[in-house]
Amino acid sequence: MRCPYCQEFESRVVDSRSGDDGSFIRRRRECNACKRRFTTYERLEERGLLVIKKGGNREAFDRKKILDGIARACEKRPVSMEEMENMVASIERELRDLYEHEVSSKAIGEMVMDRLQRRDEVAYVRFASVYRQFTDLNSFIKTIDQLKQR
């Protein structure tokens, strides 16, 4: 594994832990050259799953897109990277259990919103505003009112 700081190829594993659901391994590594530490994640490569976009286009499932969306929604919120990784792992596992070959982007978005709503309401509203394409203040108010009623 190449060091992200000095680009050295040689590093040693300092600590390894399974994710909460066992779908990935988190490894702390130390670079042999610069001695800085960094984290890597290892997971099993799964069978191909296609995502059907709103316009009907199909593209390969990319868990990084889900993680990036969750990370943007959780920016400056008390949600750790490990929690975000666990959310993505949970979503990916559910998708692979429910769908064999293809899944709609709408189904993925709903799963993300469900998990964010349970974890952090501000992150949920942030994600929903982009996912549901809020165009005015009333859209935000309606979503917040729905959260208050739960």
Swiss-Prot record:
GO biological process: negative regulation of DNA-templated transcription
Cross-referenced PANTHER family: TRANSCRIPTIONAL REPRESSOR NRDR (PTHR30455:SF2)
All copies of domain ATP-cone, residue ranges: 49-139
Domain of life: Bacteria
Annotated function: Negatively regulates transcription of bacterial ribonucleotide reductase nrd genes and operons by binding to NrdR-boxes.
One Pfam family in the UniProt entry: Zn_ribbon_NrdR
Protein name (database record): Transcriptional repressor NrdR
InterPro entries: ATP-cone_dom, NrdR-like_N, RNR_NrdR-like
Lineage: Bacteria, Bacillati, Bacillota, Clostridia, Eubacteriales
Family note: Belongs to the NrdR family.
Species: Syntrophomonas wolfei subsp. wolfei (strain DSM 2245B / Goettingen)
Cofactor: Zn(2+)
